[in-house]
Structures are given as structure tokens and as C-alpha cells.
Amino acid sequence: MATPKSSSANRKKGGKKSHRKPKRTWNVYINRSLKSINNHMSMSGRTMKIVNSFVNDLFERIACEAATVVRVNKKRTLGARELQTAVRLVLPADLAKHAMAEGTKAVSHASS
């Protein structure tokens, strides 16, 4: 008969318990956007997971492309210009144009 593992088996060196990193989700922001469009609409949990996965994938693609742009230009810092270039490369033409306009508006709103 197998014995259950003790809690000390799950501890790292030094006697501390390992903690899981909390998963980062965009659920709050997705709900805010949905409510700003139509206050009476809601999303099911499954739909929220799908939209969250879509946003995470897009974020990952833009971040990877921005890192590549920085590396190609032999720079050390990621600026607004590199992000704009990454968005233009990742998104289709019309969608990229709208994303650029909204991003510029958000940055100017946050800085003022």
C-alpha cells in the first residue's frame, strides 16, 4: 500500500512552500468594454475564456514582434515607435490603423 506524500515533499530548499503564480486574465477589462458598449449584455464563462485566450495570444504576438523589432534596430529600449511597428506587422491593414488611432488616444488620455 502506497503512503501519501508528506507536505515536506512539496517544499523547496530552505523550507518554504512553493506558490503558484496567479493566472493573469483580462476578464475585468473585457467586461468593462462590454458594459461600455451595451450595459444589458453579458458573457458566458466559456465565451469569456475564449476571448481571454484571444487577447493573450494577440498580446504575445505583438510582444514577440516588438522584441524582434528592437533587436533588429540594435536598440536596448522598447518605445512607442517599436510597438507601433509591431502592431502594423501583426495586424491586418485596416485593423492596424484603428488600433494605432485608439492606442494614440489612450496614451494621450493617460498622460494628461
UniProtKB/Swiss-Prot annotation:
SUPFAM superfamilies: Histone-fold. The keyword Transcription does not apply. Residues 1-24 are annotated as: Disordered. The keyword Cytoplasm does not apply. Keywords: Chromosome, DNA-binding, Nucleosome core, Nucleus. Gene3D superfamilies: Histone, subunit A. GO terms for molecular function: DNA binding; protein heterodimerization activity; structural constituent of chromatin. GO terms for cellular component: nucleosome; nucleus. It is found in: Nucleus; Chromosome. Residues 10-24 have a biased composition (Basic residues). The nucleosome is a histone octamer containing two molecules each of H2A, H2B, H3 and H4 assembled in one H3-H4 heterotetramer and two H2A-H2B heterodimers. The octamer wraps approximately 147 bp of DNA. Core component of nucleosome. Nucleosomes wrap and compact DNA into chromatin, limiting DNA accessibility to the cellular machineries which require DNA as a template. Histones thereby play a central role in transcription regulation, DNA repair, DNA replication and chromosomal stability. DNA accessibility is regulated via a complex set of post-translational modifications of histones, also called histone code, and nucleosome remodeling. Belongs to the histone H2B family. This is Histone H2B. It comes from Trypanosoma cruzi.
